[in-house]
């Protein structure tokens, strides 16, 4: 059966002919050497070029990373080897290495060595710790040496491929080859070693269009791979998967099974001839160099093949080797930190006859099934003995220990606990996946059908695209994961049982009330498990979350991809594994889960009984959960964080509680927030106290001015000046009618022009004094401008109604400190737009007219007219402008002002 490897193209870049490729071990970089003479570094994540080196005008046939030195080493047709620092772009070394084209360079994995091979039929060893001295020359080939590669299992030996049709094995320190592998009909272009520990193999590719697998211990050809129609230019054993990759000048890349040597897949990206293949240990990425560019593919999933039983025993598969660890072996003396790799002792359990692609314990942990290559094998978990096997595309366990296999899209078989076949189901649709658990589920591309295990009766069809399915241990809840979200459903088993017992027919949709949708969460689930009624999962952003009652809580932000293994209740820890088989644990309290579950069920009394068992450090977590359920009062009682308790108290309108928290915290922001809330609720005394504590002078100005509190405004003016809040201080002084202090504040703030203009409008008698100050200050910067300033006392003709303004100032000076009560505002509002100077002049005109009317024909006073005037005077109101109303606009000497005055008739 085929491996069914998922192959995805991750990077594609057109360029000149690519002669070699390499992957960086830590950075997301691809190194390509081009026939045009340059070397490029591409970032396959951002799909951009990171670096480019112009090496030579002739082809660069080989380039490799030396990551431990931050170098790139390249060999070209100009016979020189060049070394560059890929961080600084500096050229580290240039030296002539051969007398003909350099075909290949290979870097020793640990020692400071580089091998080079050439058309001069020589292989040379270079030591960069000795200034790139040539420390050894290997002679023996009779034609071009096309490639050299170190043996990863014995780095003291290496292999070379030559157009003399041979492959030779060499040892460092010996000038002669250990032995020669001869079997190809034409020249050998490429060679690579098998990286696994179980087979001493290497592979070669030749111009005879074949690739040969060799056992270098017996020196025999194990297998010949035929299928390409042109020269094979690149070969490799994949370091992680049981496959062989061959690339040819026929434009195809062929993927072969490394055990059965069956052709699994053929790739053709239409970029003409294949020249190079690159890989990296620990990664499933492969990079391919073509005539017209570079392609990177990713094969299979990087999810580790591992399973944990309920006691903490973990079994995993590394290639065909099966290993086991036990979490309980971590001693009590070891302090376990969340996210820290556990120091687990790995034991070899055995090997597997097929390449494992999935591995899963049965519910009681006694058996383990391994699936792969279209087959399954059931082993005992302790002794790793084979109990059953067969062909299957998929295998699932039931909650009772039975199992089902999917042989094809149209046939599913069910087996008993004793491994005996019970039933065969032929679904009426194409079953692309099956899932186990309480019910047997089969899904197509856009729906899923649930069946009971006993009689295979349809329970329910649900129209949803399913990627995975997770049953709770209780069997009452199930999570259905799709591409973008997951759904929590309740399984009503009693409803189903009563319906089936009634004998009513089941239609193609199943039992209508079998499932009840409880929650939908818009997050993609990568892996998930149930703990009681709590669903734990990691999402597409690799955050470890849990969901109780539809409320999602993030436990931890994972720094790399990790996959859930299980939960141990006695340790209150959830365990995960990464692709390197490192196991980490994270704390998740069972009492916390139980508490949230009871709250969701409305059983508050039992939830409160559990609360004392939850550590105080988790109380804020509990409070946030209660807040999300709308239980703010309970959240406030439980929360321990001062900031959070303050926010809850504000939400509840409990100002006294919030005030007590603010007193402890002494936070200006809290006092300000509380002051605004107190003001909005009419608690003005508390608002004043809060604003004072917050030093919110603007807020106090609003409060005092609204209350008409002259004493408070006076104190605020002093505070504002002390704190340098001149705008607030000015407004306070202005509202108090302290014009001299306002002008002095402007002068002290170096706002002398504004002081002069204000004096012109409100205190004409002070203008001359301020102009002198202004002139003196301005003369330091612009003497001519200073001389042009006019003093009203010297040039009264330039200032309209100057004498009238001085007279008005004298008349109203005594009234500036009197504040009419607020309830008399309407009596003054109509006169708020009156200009004092104009009013004064008009009153003078009226007096003159009245004097003329009071004289008779002989110029003597007319007693009758005088008597009428007295009556009118007694009934007319005085022309008043309220000096304490800053909200209205008053025109003074034709200027806008904010002060209001009370005018009396001129006697």
UniProtKB/Swiss-Prot annotation:
Biased composition (Acidic residues): 850-866, 874-887
Membrane topology per record: Peripheral membrane protein
PROSITE patterns xrefs: WD_REPEATS_2 (PS50082), WD_REPEATS_REGION (PS50294)
Extent of the WD repeats: 13-52, 55-94, 97-136, 140-180, 183-224, 227-266, 269-309, 351-389, 461-501
Cytoplasm is among the record's keywords: yes
Keyword Magnesium listed: no
Entry's localization field: Cytoplasm; Golgi apparatus membrane; Cytoplasmic vesicle, COPI-coated vesicle membrane
Superkingdom of the organism of origin: Eukaryota
InterPro entries, alphabetized: Beta-prop_COPA/B_2nd, Coatomer_complex_subunit, COPB2, G-protein_beta_WD-40_rep, TPR_COPA_B, WD40/YVTN_repeat-like_dom_sf, WD40_repeat_dom_sf, WD40_rpt
GO terms, biological process: endoplasmic reticulum to Golgi vesicle-mediated transport; intra-Golgi vesicle-mediated transport; intracellular protein transport; retrograde vesicle-mediated transport, Golgi to endoplasmic reticulum
Molecular function GO labels: structural molecule activity
Segments of this protein annotated with the region Disordered: 850-887
Pfam families: B-prop_COPA_B_2nd, TPR_COPA_B, WD40
Keywords: Cytoplasm, Cytoplasmic vesicle, ER-Golgi transport, Golgi apparatus, Membrane, Protein transport, Repeat, Transport, WD repeat
GO cellular component assignments: COPI vesicle coat; Golgi membrane
Complex formation: Oligomeric complex that consists of at least the alpha, beta, beta', gamma, delta, epsilon and zeta subunits.
Protein family (similarity comment): Belongs to the WD repeat COPB2 family.
Chain's role: The coatomer is a cytosolic protein complex that binds to dilysine motifs and reversibly associates with Golgi non-clathrin-coated vesicles, which further mediate biosynthetic protein transport from the ER, via the Golgi up to the trans Golgi network. Coatomer complex is required for budding from Golgi membranes, and is essential for the retrograde Golgi-to-ER transport of dilysine-tagged proteins.
Protein name (database record): Coatomer subunit beta'-1
Organism of this sequence: Oryza sativa subsp. japonica
């Amino acid at each position: 059966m085929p491996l069914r490897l998922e192959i995805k193209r991750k990077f594609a870049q057109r360029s000149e002919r690519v002669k070699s490729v390499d992957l960086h071990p830590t950075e997301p970089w691809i190194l390509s050497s081009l026939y045009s003479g340059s070397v490029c570094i591409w970032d396959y994540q951002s799909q951009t070029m990171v670096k480019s080196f112009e090496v030579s005008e002739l082809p660069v046939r080989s380039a490799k990373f030396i990551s431990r030195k931050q170098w790139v080493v390249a060999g070209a047709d100009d016979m020189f080897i060049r070394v560059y620092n890929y961080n600084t772009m500096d050229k580290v070394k240039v030296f002539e290495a051969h007398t003909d084209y350099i075909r290949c360079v290979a870097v020793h994995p640990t020692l400071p060595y580089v091998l080079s091979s050439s058309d001069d039929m020589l292989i040379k060893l270079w030591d960069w710790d000795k200034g790139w001295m040539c420390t050894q020359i290997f002679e023996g080939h009779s034609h071009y040496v096309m490639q050299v590669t170190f043996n990863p299992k014995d780095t003291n030996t290496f292999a070379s491929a030559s157009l003399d049709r041979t492959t030779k094995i060499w040892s460092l320190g010996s000038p002669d080859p250990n032995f020669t592998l001869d079997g190809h009909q034409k020249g050998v272009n490429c060679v690579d070693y098998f990286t696994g520990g179980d087979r001493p193999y290497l592979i070669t590719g030749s111009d005879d269009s074949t690739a040969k697998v060799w056992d270098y211990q017996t020196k025999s050809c194990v297998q010949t791979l035929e299928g390409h129609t042109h020269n094979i230019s690149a070969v490799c054993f994949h370091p992680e998967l049981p496959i062989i990759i061959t690339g040819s000048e026929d434009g195809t890349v062929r993927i072969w099974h490394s055990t059965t040597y069956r052709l699994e897949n053929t790739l053709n990206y239409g970029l003409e001839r294949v020249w190079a293949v690159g890989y990296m240990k620990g990664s499933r990425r492969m990079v391919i160099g073509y005539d017209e560019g570079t392609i990177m593919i990713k094969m299979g999933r990087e999810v580790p093949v591992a399973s944990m039983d309920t006691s903490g025993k973990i079994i995993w598969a590394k290639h065909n080797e099966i290993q086991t660890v036990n979490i309980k072996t971590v001693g009590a003396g070891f302090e376990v930190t969340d996210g820290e790799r556990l120091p687990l002792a790995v034991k070899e359990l055995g090997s597997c006859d097929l390449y494992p692609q999935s591995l899963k314990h049965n519910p009681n942990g006694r058996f383990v099934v391994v699936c792969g290559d279209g087959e399954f094998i059931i082993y005992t978990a302790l002794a790793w003995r084979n109990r059953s096997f067969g062909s299957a595309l998929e295998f699932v366990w039931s909650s009772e220990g039975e199992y089902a296999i999917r042989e094809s899209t149209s046939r599913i078989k069910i087996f008993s606990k004793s491994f005996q076949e019970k039933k065969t189901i032929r679904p009426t649709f194409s079953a692309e996946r099956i899932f186990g658990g309480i019910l047997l589920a089969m899904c197509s591309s856009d729906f899923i059908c649930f069946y009971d295990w006993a009689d295979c009766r349809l329970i329910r069809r649900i129209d949803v695209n399913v990627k995975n399915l997770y049953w709770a241990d209780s069997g009452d809840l199930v999570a259905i994961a799709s591409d973008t979200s997951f759904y929590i459903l309740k399984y009503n088993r009693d409803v189903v049982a009563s319906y089936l017992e009634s004998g009513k027919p089941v239609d193609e949709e199943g039992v209508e009330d079998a499932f009840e949708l409880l929650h939908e969460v818009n997050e993609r689930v990568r892996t998930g498990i149930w703990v009681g009624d709590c669903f734990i999962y990691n999402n597409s952003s690799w955050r470890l979350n849990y969901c109780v009652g539809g409320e999602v809580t993030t436990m931890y932000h994972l720094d790399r991809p990790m996959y859930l293994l299980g939960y141990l209740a006695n340790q209150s820890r959830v365990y995960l594994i990464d692709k390197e088989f490192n196991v980490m644990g994270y704390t998740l309290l069972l009492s916390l889960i139980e508490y949230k579950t009871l709250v969701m069920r409305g059983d508050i009394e039992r939830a409160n009984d559990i609360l004392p068992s939850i550590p105080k450090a988790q109380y804020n977590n509990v409070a946030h959960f209660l807040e999300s359920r709308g239980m703010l009062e309970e959240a406030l009682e439980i929360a321990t964080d001062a900031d959070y308790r303050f926010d809850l108290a504000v939400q509840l309108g409990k100002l006294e509680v919030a005030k007590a928290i603010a007193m402890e915290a002494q936070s200006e922001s809290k006092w300000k927030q509380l002051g605004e809330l107190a003001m909005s609720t009419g608690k003005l005394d508390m608002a004043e106290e809060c604003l004072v504590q917050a030093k919110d002078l603007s807020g106090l100005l609003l409060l005092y001015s609204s209350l008409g509190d002259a004493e408070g405004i006076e104190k605020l003016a002093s505070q504002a000046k002390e704190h340098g809040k001149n705008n607030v201080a000015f407004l306070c002084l202005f509202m108090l009618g302290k014009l001299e202090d306002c002008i002095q504040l402007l002068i002290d703030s170096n706002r002398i022009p504004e002081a002069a203009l204000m004096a012109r409008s409100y205190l004409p008698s002070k203008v001359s004094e301020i102009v002198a100050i202004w002139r003196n200050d301005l003369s330091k910067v612009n003497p001519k401008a200073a001389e042009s300033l006019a003093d009203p006392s010297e040039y009264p003709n330039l200032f309209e109604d100057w004498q009238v303004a001085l007279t008005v100032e004298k008349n109203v000076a005594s009234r500036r400190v009197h504040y009419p009560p607020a309830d008399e505002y309407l009596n003054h509002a109509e006169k708020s737009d009156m200009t004092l100077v104009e009013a004064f002049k008009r009153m003078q005109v009226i007096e003159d007219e009245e004097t003329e009317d009071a004289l008779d024909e002989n110029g003597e006073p007319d007693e009758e007219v005088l008597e009428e005037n007295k009556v009118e005077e007694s009934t007319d109101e005085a022309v008043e402008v309220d000096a304490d109303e800053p909200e209205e606009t008053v025109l003074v000497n034709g200027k806008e002002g904010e002060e209001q005055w009370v005018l009396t008739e001129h006697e």
